[in-house]
Regions:
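Charged, low-complexity surface segments at secondary-structure and domain boundaries
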Residues: 11, 81-87, 378-388
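Cleavable N-terminal signal peptides of Sec/SRP-targeted secreted and luminal proteins
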Residues: 2-16
C-alpha cells in the first residue's frame, strides 16, 4: 500500500478561520476539487456588488439570511475503540497531528460533535462488557477497559476542541449476553423482559462513570440499528419494544438519577424511520422522554423520510449518527466518490432539518480496522501503524467544508440553486458570518452568481468540487 504522508504544514496550513471582523460585503471562497491539488484551499475573495435584474441566461445561488430554521448542534465523527487503539499505536507527533487535524477549529476542521459506544461494538478488538455475568445489582460495574485507550483519546479530543465546544453522545450495540434471549452479544437476539430494568440502570451507570472521568455524555441513543441482526454486537428492538423500554425503564431511570441526558430513538436507516419513530412518538408517555430521532445512511437515501419525521413531529429533533463507506479496499482509497457521497448526504440531511451530523470512525488503521469481526471500512484518515504514516482521504476535506465553517449554534438559512448541476445549503453563524456550501457532482465547471439581498458575487464551481463561500 502506498500512503501519502500529509504533513501538518501542507495539509492544514490553509485552514484559516473565518473572521467576524471583516467587511460584510466580502465573499471568501474555499475549494476542494478533483484532479487538482486544492484541498480546502482558499481560492480568493470577491466583493458583493449591486446586481442588475436576474436573467435566465445565468445561474444563481440565492441566499436569504432572514429566513432561519434549525439550530446546529455540531458536526463530527465517532471516537471508537478502533480509532483510539490506532491512535495510540502512532508516534506522538502523529497523534498531535490527528488531534489538530480533526478537533482544532482554527488549524483543523473543528469537529464539534462525537459519538462513542457503551462497552464493545464491532470496531473493538474484542467483545466485552462492564460487569460480571448475572450481576443484576451491577456491583461489579467497572469501565477500566476504556481507560487504556478510548477515554484518554476522548479526553485529548475534548482538550483540543475545548470542552465547551464539543458535544458527546453514546450508543449501545448490545446488552451483555446474559441479558439476551440468544445468550450472545452478537447475531441479534432480544433483551429479555426480566432485564429491562437492569439494562436501563446499566446505561445510567455508564453515563455516570464517564461523567466522573470528566466527560459529559450529552445524549444517548436507545439501541444502535435496532432492526439489524448482525455478526457483530446487535440487539433487536421492535418499535413497540423500544417505546415500552423508553417509557417504563430508560426514561424514568435517567430522570430518577437526576441526569439531563437526551434520549434519541431509532438510530438506524432512513428507509423505515417514519414508521418506527411514529410508533414511539404517538405515545405521549414515551414521547415525553424523547429528545429526538437519530438515523444512519445505509441501504438507500430516502431523504423524504427525514422531512416527513420533521414535519410530523416539529417539536422533536433530528440527528444523523452514522455513515461510512466500505468495504475497505486499498485500491479505492483515492476514489473521489467517497467525499461526494458525504457532501450529498449532508446537504440533503441539513436541508431536511437535521441538527447535527456524525461520521463513523474518525481514524482506522491500514486494514480499515481494528474490527473483531473483520467488518473493515473506510475512515477520513487512515494510519499505517507500522510506518506511522497518515493518509487523508478526500472525505476528510469534504466533511471539513461543513464542520470548519458551520459552527455550533449556527442556524440554517434559505439557499436555493437555479440549476440542478449545483446542490447547496447555507447557515448563519453566531458571529454573523454566513457559510454557503456549493456541491458540483458533474464533469463540467459551472459558473454562477451568489445572490444575497440584491447583491451578487461571481463564482465558478469546478467539475467534481465542493465550495464553501464565507460571507463576512
Amino acid at each position: 500500500m502506498k500512503y501519502l504522508l500529509l504533513a501538518v504544514t501542507t495539509a492544514l496550513a490553509f485552514l484559516l478561520a473565518p473572521s467576524s471582523q471583516a467587511d460584510p460585503s466580502h465573499v471568501t471562497c474555499y475549494v476542494t476539487a478533483e484532479s487538482t491539488g486544492q484541498r480546502l484551499a482558499e481560492a480568493g475573495t470577491e466583493d458583493l456588488v449591486d446586481s442588475p435584474s436576474i436573467t435566465e441566461k445565468q445561474e444563481y445561488i440565492f441566499v436569504d439570511p432572514s429566513k432561519t430554521f434549525q439550530t446546529i448542534l455540531g458536526i463530527g465523527g465517532a471516537l471508537t475503540d478502533a480509532s483510539a487503539e490506532t491512535f495510540y499505536k502512532l508516534p506522538k507527533s502523529k497523534q498531535r497531528e490527528i488531534l489538530k487535524a480533526y478537533f482544532d477549529p482554527k488549524n483543523g476542521v473543528g469537529y464539534s460533535l462525537g459519538r462513542t459506544h457503551i462497552h464493545s461494538c464491532d470496531f473493538s478488538s474484542e467483545s466485552y462488557t462492564y460487569v460480571k455475568d448475572y450481576d443484576t445489582n451491577l456491583d461489579s460495574f467497572d469501565i477500566s477497559h476504556d481507560l487504556k485507550y478510548r477515554i484518554p483519546f476522548i479526553k485529548a479530543a475534548l482538550a483540543t476542541a475545548g470542552k465547551d465546544n464539543f458535544t458527546l453522545f453514546a450508543s449501545p450495540w448490545s446488552p451483555p449476553a446474559w441479558m439476551k434471549d440468544n445468550t450472545n452479544m452478537l447475531h441479534g437476539g432480544k433483551l429479555l423482559p426480566q432485564y429491562d430494568d437492569c439494562w436501563a440502570r446499566y446505561c445510567c451507570k455508564f453515563l455516570q462513570a464517564y461523567e466522573q472521568q470528566g466527560m459529559h455524555i450529552w445524549g444517548m441513543t436507545v439501541q444502535n440499528e435496532p432492526l439489524a441482526i448482525q455478526p457483530w454486537e446487535s440487539c433487536v428492538f421492535s418499535a413497540e419494544d423500544e417505546r415500552d423500554f423508553v417509557k417504563n425503564y430508560l426514561g424514568p431511570e435517567i430522570q430518577k438519577e437526576g441526569l439531563n441526558t437526551k434520549i434519541m430513538i431509532w438510530d438506524h436507516n432512513r428507509g423505515l424511520m417514519y414508521n418506527y419513530a411514529s410508533a414511539i412518538l404517538d405515545d405521549p408517555d414515551a414521547a415525553k422522554y424523547v429528545w429526538g430521532v437519530a438515523y444512519h445512511w445505509y441501504v438507500n437515501d430516502s431523504f423524504e423520510n427525514v422531512k416527513s419525521v420533521k414535519e410530523a413531529y416539529p417539536e422533536k429533533h433530528l440527528l444523523f449518527t452514522e455513515g461510512c463507506n466500505g468495504p475497505f479496499d486499498t485500491s479505492q482509497l483515492t476514489n473521489w466518490i467517497w467525499g461526494e457521497k458525504y457532501a450529498t448526504s449532508m446537504i440533503h440531511d441539513f436541508d431536511n432539518g437535521v441538527e447535527g451530523w456524525t461520521d463513523w470512525n474518525v481514524l482506522l488503521d491500514e486494514k480499515g480496522g481494528p474490527n473483531h469481526v473483520q467488518n473493515y471500512c473506510f475512515a477520513p484518515i487512515h494510519a499505517d501503524t507500522k510506518t506511522g504514516k497518515l493518509f487523508y482521504m478526500d472525505s476528510y476535506y469534504y466533511i471539513g467544508h461543513f464542520s470548519k465553517f458551520i459552527r455550533p449554534g449556527a442556524k440554517r438559512i434559505i439557499s436555493s440553486s437555479s440549476t440542478d448541476n449545483l446542490l447547496t445549503t447555507a447557515f448563519i453563524n453566531v458571529d454573523g458570518t454566513i457559510s454557503i456550501i456549493v456541491l458540483n457532482l458533474t464533469d463540467q465547471p459551472e459558473n454562477f452568481n451568489l445572490w444575497i439581498h440584491g447583491k451578487v458575487a461571481q463564482n465558478v464551481s469546478p467539475a467534481h468540487s465542493i465550495l464553501t463561500l464565507v460571507v463576512s
